[in-house]
Amino acid sequence: MLLLQDLMGDNCELEMISGGCDKETHRRRFRTKLIAMGMCGYDRVIVEPSGIYDVDEFFDVLHDEPLDKWYEIGNVVTIVDAKLESGLSEEADYLLASEAANAGSIILSRAEEATKEQIENTIEHLNRALEQVQCKRRLDREIMRKDGAELSEEDFDKILKSGYVAENYRKMELDEKKGFDSLYFMELKISADELKTQVAKMMQDPECGVIFRVKGFVKDDAGSWMQLNATGHEISMKPIGDGQEVVIVIGEQLKEDCIRKYLEN
């Protein structure tokens, strides 16, 4: 929400659906939000998930009454790390496949930082994940192999008209208690430098679980906001105009107590 504040105005509003709940509760909140927005007369709605997302929720809810009469699905765009890690679990590969199978276009984030070999390995990984869930689709022309800043008007027009693909694949029931999670840590009393150091340590500690990403905001010694973004490849801390005292940890089989020790001690 904070990163999208510049878009707000008379013709654009931002709404948020709270996470940290079970699957059915989140689906109900999503449906309720779409009904409320439909009654407000919006003519375009962009759904931007954060963290681990069940794609079936999106399609299932939009086929419920009365939403099936109010909304029409336009484009499904999937953003994939151009330097995608190779050693993902079966469950993680399933999520990767499910979030790519229906996409009309796929954008490789941080493509400018990746080598040609890394990009090709990522594309091979995507198609291998699709094959593992018995999906017949193979991705190639749908993939934007360039940095977001390099996208041309022609590229954006292609994305705008890319639509989506109603693809079939084998579903996997993910155990909510043992699977993927997003943990939120509010108002941490930690400096920007110390946060960066502690995040690097906990991402290497198997006792914390498998951490995919850590993101959030913290103030530096001068009282200015800094934005943290950490993956298995790198950890960055960059200035940002506004922020909120929150750190979000995304991963698989996360151990909150262990992670909290790094962030609070």
Where are these regions (language model features)?
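Nucleotide-state-sensitive switch-loop elements of NTP-binding domains
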Residues: 1-89
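Short, well-ordered beta-strand elements
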Residues: 245-251
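Charged, alpha-helix-enriched surfaces in structured cytosolic catalytic cores
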Residues: 25-28, 53, 57, 71, ...
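C-terminal accessory "lid"/substrate-recognition subdomains
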Residues: 102-108, 113-242, 253-256, 264-265
